[in-house]
Swiss-Prot record:
PANTHER family: CHIMERIN FAMILY MEMBER (PTHR46075), N-CHIMAERIN (PTHR46075:SF1). SMART domains: C1, RhoGAP, SH2. It comes from Mus musculus (Mouse). This is N-chimaerin. Residues 268-459 form the Rho-GAP domain. One of its GO terms (molecular function) is GTPase activator activity. Keywords: Acetylation, GTPase activation, Metal-binding, Neurogenesis, Phosphoprotein, SH2 domain, Zinc, Zinc-finger. Transmembrane segments: none annotated. Disruption phenotype: Mice are viable and fertile but display a loss of coordination of limb movement which phenocopies the one of Epha4 mutant mice.
Amino acid sequence: MALTLFDTDEYRPPVWKSYLYQLQQEAPHPRRVTCTCEVENRPKYYGREYHGMISREETDQLLSVAEGSYLIRESQRQPGTYTLALRFGSQTRNFRLYYDGKHFVGEKRFESIHDLVTDGLITLYIETKAAEYIAKMTINPIYEHIGYTTLNREPAYKQHMAVLKETHDEKEATGQDGVSEKRLTSLVRRATLKENEQIPKYEKVHNFKVHTFRGPHWCEYCANFMWGLIAQGVKCADCGLNVHKQCSKMVPNDCKPDLKHVKKVYSCDLTTLVKAHITKRPMVVDMCIREIESRGLNSEGLYRVSGFSDLIEDVKMAFDRDGEKADISVNMYEDINIITGALKLYFRDLPIPLITYDAYPKFIESAKIMDPDEQLETLHEALRSLPPAHCETLRYLMAHLKRVTLHEKENLMSAENLGIVFGPTLMRSPELDPMAALNDIRYQRLVVELLIKNEDILF
């Protein structure tokens, strides 16, 4: 039966393209031209390939023996500087050579001259033979067909369905019905309804870093070989996607972080975290707010009173270590100020603030407007400029803080007081000038106060 399937199946060309790999195999090999006499003042980091201060004509003669021949000479025009002379394409190529603990002529740095020359010959050969091919590599990508997106779709879908099933089971267990829903305030009901919406598909740019691949590697965007000895391409630090540097410019903003690349919860980019864990908001925000609302809304000075810093650090480490399994219950942390402190610390530790640097000026400008209607309209526009994951988290936090103000008689925390606490926590000035940042503090407070008071209108 398997044979029949094979016979009737249509022919499909190989996914991975071998042309550039074959070219790398054909590239000239390095041939060191050694100096037969002892050279005075030879730098200790060069070997017998160093010939001292010889002329270009003598260099040409020494290298004419074969393609890939190389030597190092001291420049006659600029004594104290060194040149790597390399035979390629029946010509001598001269490159200014540098050393800072590693050898380099460009961006790449090498442990040995031999590796530098090997990589250089591969690059010269491929770029000479396949310049037109390389220029067109990105035209017909395989990325959307068999690449990263497809490979990650099934696990994400299964986990998402598990989340939806868990929500449904919780409803049945608690016996929710129309009567209980009517008893909810409109504020809480809206937040509850939004909780049950499907997890949105947030866009996230890939976090590409130059990477050295050990062994042959192929680009997961264009399917072509990634040539060279080191720094052959880039790798996404969040999802592990491997592509050519030029292909990285074409990859869509669809990074789906792998949990093995996301090592912690605190100090992690917010969008990266929610995509890695397939959640609407960071787990820290959801879990801390649930805990605070279950036992802390009447606590005097909620969010204003500081918790014990060592225990707040314990909560942080628990989230970094255990994620959503972190225990922040009353049995572990009786003082609710420890939980509020951990939540504030999460926002302070974000590398990109909840109200992002890009959106910051728009929020500050809205706070300066005197006309209330125009102010809200401008604030609404500012919210639209936030990344979706940031906006959703801000919405959830403001709905929570609005509920905190409903208990103001007991906890003494008004929208104004909460603005004082959360203004500098959620917003950080992109200005390096400390005086300019200091002048913005009152507007930061006002922004948060306005967001809390008008939460039902703005979100």
